[in-house]
């Protein structure tokens, strides 16, 4: 008897190959992708790279997403596969097999599936992991390594994780069988055929959740707010999407049916009545397709736009090859002599054989303020980006402005040049206790990190250094009275360098280890920070390259899951529609009318998720725009083009997949019992 179970399990899988092969393919692909992601995240070569740590962190996040998503997609496909076999299990039960015997058969089926999925999945991981490592290295600017990339640790973790997952799938299937009786299993194929009831409360709740999620996105206009608002908005939209497909769609269709002028037409009559039943059976699956489609669009469009905008961001972040910032003690009001420090810097670059060019030096004071119309109230608090009225104020004198731009300007006392990345100011600005007459600038060559992070910044050019110090004194007086951080007078020294990145980095290391540099800074009573493009850009490229790789990787996973759900929906709809096809012909409809009616229903049902995903993206655009702003992308036009391009490509792929699976659907519909 026991030898019968393995043979019966193999026969069952072969007989159900139309449903089983896609399920097995899903298992193989998910195993391979998980193992590849785990292999890349734990690649020791990344740890040895100078800037590989950030990439490992990004990929480690991807492993967590893959683990969660693997469980979700395998439970979905397994439940779909099991649902199609309920009648088969009922017949076994009626013919005399006990439920424990069916469990033995299910055990062998699961064992076959797990063995094939792990074997072929790990083989595929071994084949493609090296290729994907080369792609990753190309994106992050690393060098390719030789040898097989997959490691025993990755294989072991994959086997343990999916072994446990397949065990849970088996236990869940056995639970379903043991909790059902043969009559319930025989009727499972026709469950849901009764007309669904209108669920007004759920429909209203779905509309409210969608509206709330959309409203959060539309009202988010600060970059750092966008990050904390993203997940609540996503959760609301996901809940709203499921409730909309499950409840609101039925309510709308029934409302159309009550409209006699619309409903009692040949095409509308059959289409609306058929869609009521189709949406009842397929609402959750269609909502899942919509959510997955939205995830593909968001993931790919954001990572592509960030990577495409990398160089533009770097040019803003590092306007020159080297930036040295000398900061005075905030407790002193003296202007330090920084010339000895700068001489050490220049001498170090000369000894390294590097030539300086485009040398600029200027003094600035930075402090925070709260905007109210054309007035700025001084504040000693740190900038958080928690308000659209929060500004970082950067003040420099006309000498520094001339050094930066080459433009000589003359300002009278109480007058200032002004440029802001926020809303324009009027003719005057009240700052602290003073009122400044403003002359607006069309552009400004100095962009601070606050602009990059999405915080508003105001740049003021005042007549002389004394005016700079006066504004600093006002801010420090406010800080002394209310507590908080006093502002510092900074001297920024910037220049470009000849030579390679490695030569520039060597020169920087030489400078920082030079006792003369330390002693000159101490003598001037200044602290310092250095920022070199040759040091920061590779880290930035590695991080954004890792994001792009993860975006495409997860985008492929989400797309694969979408294709899988569409296939199962088409096949299950095909089997369900075989009987309806005959019934509609028997009541007088011609085969051409029947086919047109069913085609209309299927088209509306399967393209509704794509249309809904497009609506989600349109409403999410303001929120996602602020998030990419926080990561440094300030080019809205580029982000819009990437979003539209991603949607266009995805819509073509979606249509192609639909047409392929539709062929399977029509073959099933035309089959005879």
Where are these regions (language model features)?
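Alpha-helical transmembrane segments, especially those used as permease/efflux helices
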Residues: 21-26, 32-36, 160-165, 194-306, ...
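Small-residue-rich transmembrane alpha-helices
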Residues: 31-43, 76-78, 87, 113-142, ...
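Basic-flanked hydrophobic alpha-helices used for secretion and membrane insertion
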Residues: 313-560
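Juxtamembrane interface at the cytosolic side of transmembrane helices
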Residues: 76, 82-84, 176, 222, ...
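Hydrophobic alpha-helical transmembrane segments of multi-pass inner-membrane transport and secretion
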Residues: 18-45, 53-87, 110-124, 238, ...
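Short cytosolic juxtamembrane segments of multi-pass membrane proteins
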Residues: 3-7, 179-193, 575-576, 666-673
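A short amphipathic helical element positioned immediately N-terminal to and/or at the very start
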Residues: 5-16, 270-278
């Amino acid at each position: 008897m026991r030898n019968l179970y393995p043979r019966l399990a193999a026969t069952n899988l072969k007989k159900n190959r139309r449903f089983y092969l896609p399920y097995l393919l899903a298992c193989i692909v998910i195993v391979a992708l998980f193992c590849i992601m785990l292999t890349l995240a734990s690649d020791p070569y990344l740890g040895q790279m100078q800037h590989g740590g950030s990439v490992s962190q990004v990929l480690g996040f991807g492993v967590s997403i893959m683990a969660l998503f693997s469980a979700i997609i395998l439970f979905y496909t397994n439940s779909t596969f099991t649902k199609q076999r309920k009648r088969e299990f009922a017949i076994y039960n009626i013919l005399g097999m006990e439920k424990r015997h069916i469990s033995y058969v299910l055990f062998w089926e699961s064992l076959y599936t797990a063995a094939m999925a792990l074997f072929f999945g790990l083989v595929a991981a071994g084949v493609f992991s090296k290729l994907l490592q080369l792609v990753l290295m190309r994106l992050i600017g690393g060098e390719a390594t030789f040898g097989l990339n997959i490691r025993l640790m990755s294989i072991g973790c994959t086997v343990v994780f999916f072994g446990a997952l397949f065990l849970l799938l088996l236990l869940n299937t056995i639970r379903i069988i043991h909790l059902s009786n043969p009559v319930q299993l025989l009727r499972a194929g026709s469950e849901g055929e009764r007309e669904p009831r209108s669920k007004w409360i759920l429909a209203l709740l779905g509309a409210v959740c969608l509206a709330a999620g959309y409203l959060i996105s539309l009202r988010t206009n600060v970059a750092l707010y966008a990050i904390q608002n993203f997940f609540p908005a996503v959760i609301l939209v996901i809940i709203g999407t499921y409730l909309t497909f499950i409840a609101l769609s039925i309510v709308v269709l029934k409302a159309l049916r009550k409209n006699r002028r619309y409903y009692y037409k040949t095409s509308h009559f059959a289409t609306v009545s058929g869609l009521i039943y189709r949406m009842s059976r397929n609402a959750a699956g269609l909502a899942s397709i919509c959510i997955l489609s939205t995830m593909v669009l968001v993931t790919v469009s954001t990572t592509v736009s960030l990577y495409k905008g990398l160089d533009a961001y770097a040019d803003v972040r590092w306007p020159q090859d080297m930036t040295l910032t000398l900061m005075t003690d905030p407790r002193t009001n003296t202007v330090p002599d920084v010339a000895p420090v700068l001489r050490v810097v220049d001498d170090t670059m000369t000894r390294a054989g590097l030539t300086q060019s485009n040398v600029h030096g200027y003094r600035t004071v930075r402090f925070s303020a709260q905007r109210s119309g054309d007035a700025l109230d001084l504040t000693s608090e740190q900038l958080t980006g928690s308000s659209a009225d929060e500004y970082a104020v950067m003040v420099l004198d006309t000498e520094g402005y001339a050094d930066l731009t080459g433009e000589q300007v003359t300002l009278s006392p109480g007058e200032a040049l002004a440029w802001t990345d926020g809303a324009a100011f009027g003719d005057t600005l009240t700052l602290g206790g003073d009122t400044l007459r403003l002359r607006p600038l069309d552009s400004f060559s100095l962009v601070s990190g606050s602009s990059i992070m999405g915080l508003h910044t105001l740049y003021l050019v005042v007549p002389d250094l004394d005016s700079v110090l006066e504004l600093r004194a006002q801010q420090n007086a406010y800080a002394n009275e209310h507590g908080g951080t006093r502002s510092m007078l900074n001297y920024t020294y910037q220049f470009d360098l000849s030579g390679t990145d490695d030569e520039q980095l060597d020169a920087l290391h030489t400078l920082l280890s030079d006792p003369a540099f330390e002693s000159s800074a101490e003598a001037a009573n200044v602290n310092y920070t250095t920022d070199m493009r040759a040091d920061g850009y590779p880290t930035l490229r590695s991080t954004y390259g890792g994001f792009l790789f993860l975006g495409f990787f997860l985008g492929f996973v989400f797309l694969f899951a979408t294709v899988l759900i569409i296939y199962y929906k088409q096949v299950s709809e095909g089997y369900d529609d075989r009987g309806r096809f005959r019934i509609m012909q028997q009541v007088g409809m011609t085969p051409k009318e029947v086919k047109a009616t069913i085609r209309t229903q299927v088209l509306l049902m399967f393209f509704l998720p794509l249309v809904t995903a497009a609506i989600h993206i349109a409403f999410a655009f303001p929120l996602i725009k602020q998030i990419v702003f926080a990561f440094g992308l300030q080019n809205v036009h580029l982000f819009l083009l990437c979003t539209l391009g991603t949607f266009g490509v995805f819509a073509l792929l979606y249509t192609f997949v639909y047409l392929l699976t539709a062929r399977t659907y029509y073959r099933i519909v035309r089959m005879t019992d």
